[in-house]
Amino acid sequence: MIQKETNLVVADNSGAKKVRCIHVFGGTGRRYAAIGDQIMVTVKAAVPGGVVKKKDVCKAVVVRCAKEKKRKDGSYIRFDENAVVLLNAQGEPRGTRIFGPVARELRDRKYMKIVSLAPEVL
C-alpha cells in the first residue's frame, strides 16, 4: 500500500531514481494506492542530464508494490519493493525503457505501453 510520504524507486529511464508520494488520486479521502493506481510524486534523487530533475512534481503509476494483492484466481502477487513509472500529461510513460518486472494488473488498467516495454509481466 502506498500513501502520502511513501518513498518509492523509479522503474524507468526518465532520469529520476527516487521519488516520494505526495497525493493519491481517486477520491476525496482516498488514503492508499496499489498496483495500477495513479499517484502524484516529487523527485527526491535524479541522475544528471535526465529528463526530470530533482524537485520536479509529476504523475506516476504504481507498477510494483510490497503489499500483497489477491487475484481473481486466488493467488497473491507481491514484490520486494515499491516502484513507479513516471507519466506525462497524456498518461504515457516519460521514459523509453522499463526496468524489472511489472504486474499483470496494468494490462487491465489500459497501461499497454508500459506492459509492452517491460521485460517481464508477472
Curated annotation (Swiss-Prot):
Per the record, the similarity remark reads: Belongs to the universal ribosomal protein uL14 family.
Q: Subunit structure, per the record? A: Part of the 50S ribosomal subunit. Forms a cluster with proteins L3 and L19. In the 70S ribosome, L14 and L19 interact and together make contacts with the 16S rRNA in bridges B5 and B8.
Which HAMAP family does its entry note? Ribosomal_uL14 (MF_01367)
| Free-text function comment from the UniProt entry | Binds to 23S rRNA. Forms part of two intersubunit bridges in the 70S ribosome.
For this chain, one GO molecular function annotation is: large ribosomal subunit rRNA binding
Which InterPro entries does this one have? Ribosomal_uL14, Ribosomal_uL14_bac-type, Ribosomal_uL14_CS, Ribosomal_uL14_sf
Enumerate the PANTHER family for this protein: 50S/60S RIBOSOMAL PROTEIN L14/L23, LARGE RIBOSOMAL SUBUNIT PROTEIN UL14M
Q: Name one GO cellular component term.
A: cytosolic large ribosomal subunit
Q: Per the database entry, which stretches of residues form a coiled coil?
A: none
Task: List the GO biological process terms.
Answer: translation
Protein biosynthesis keyword on record: no
> What organism is recorded for this protein?
Prosthecochloris aestuarii (strain DSM 271 / SK 413)
Keywords, A to Z? Ribonucleoprotein, Ribosomal protein, RNA-binding, rRNA-binding
Question: Know the name of this protein?
Answer: Large ribosomal subunit protein uL14
